[in-house]
Design a protein with these regions (language model features):
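His/Asp/Glu-rich mid-to-C-terminal helical/loop segments that flank catalytic regions of hydrolases
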Residues: 213-241
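N-terminal short beta-loop-beta anion/metal-coordinating cradle
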Residues: 1-76, 229-230
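Non-transmembrane, aqueous-exposed alpha-helical and coiled segments at domain scale
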Residues: 48-51, 61-63, 70, 75-85, ...
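Alpha-helix C-terminal capping segments
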Residues: 57, 83-86, 98-104, 191-199
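Active-site rim beta-loop-alpha module in soluble metabolic enzymes
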Residues: 127-178
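A C-terminal functional module that forms or caps the active site or interfaces directly
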Residues: 171-210, 215
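Acidic/polar active-site rim loop that often engages polyanionic ligands
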Residues: 111-128
Length: 241
């Protein structure tokens, strides 16, 4: 860990749980807290990085849900400070764009590894391919497959690619052929986890697909809410395993 053993950007107002969910979107952190935590208390409000904590509805054990903001630099800062505060395992619950035609809107992806096409994971000295914690990723896959009958969407497992740009352009290099989807934070979070010997994993919902001509199809708000709730339930189950 770098030489800042205290939290500078997170100002906790409640006790941190040892297990943490990491959505990027502060609004999704609130929505997940309202669904997954009984009587959630605000954990952090500073910098607009909303976080919530309390007993999980599923098992009564402490759970914290902390937004990371967008992109690898912000995500790395948040996880670093959570480690300083005592987190023991973390799961990113986020969104992604499909890179394969067999993926549909609302499908869930368990990221076994992230291919770092970003600056943050490289700055952290990580290899280009950074693995999720194997045991936590396997727990996510089991939980997702057990729930798929209720959720009625497909579950996929494999590599994703993490990038710095959301609005890509022709100067960006082509994505690796084995990547299922593209997102922005997993490589940085995995890199921080590896450096700190912290189990970190990632479950993603597909929110964008692209046809052969490159036209984007975007998930609607209701379907996104359902997908986020599914991801949250899967992640809590995995953290309880």
């Amino acid at each position: 860990m770098p030489a800042y053993p205290q939290a500078i950007h997170l100002h906790p107002t409640a006790e941190l749980a040892e297990r943490v969910l990491l959505p990027g979107d502060p609004g999704r952190a609130l929505a997940l807290a309202q669904t997954l935590i009984s009587e959630p208390r605000m954990f952090n409000h500073h910098r607009g990085l909303w976080g919530y904590t309390g007993p999980a509805c599923a098992d009564g054990e402490p759970l914290t849900i902390q937004a990371t903001g967008m992109g690898g630099p912000s995500a790395a800062i948040v996880l670093h400070e959570l480690i300083c505060l005592g987190v023991s395992r973390a799961i990113r619950v986020g969104t992604c764009g499909a890179l394969r035609p067999d993926l549909g809107l609302g499908d869930l992806i368990i990221a076994r590894e992230s291919i770092g096409a970003d600056g943050t994971s490289r700055a952290l000295g990580a290899d280009q391919r950074i693995a999720a914690d194997p045991a936590l990723a396997e727990a996510l896959l089991r939980a997702a497959r057990a729930q798929v009958g209720d959720y009625t969407r497909c579950v996929h497992s494999g590599a994703v690619v993490s990038v710095d740009l959301f609005y890509d352009d022709s100067r960006a290099p082509p994505h690796p052929a084995d990547a299922l989807a593209v997102e922005m934070e997993a490589a940085s979070l995995f890199a921080v986890g590896v450096a700190a010997s912290l189990p970190v994993a990632c479950v993603l919902a597909v929110t964008d697909t692209f046809d052969a001509a490159g036209s984007r199809r975007r998930i609607d708000d209701h379907a996104l809410l359902i997908a986020a709730e599914a991801m949250g339930a899967v992640a809590v189950t995995a953290l309880s395993a």
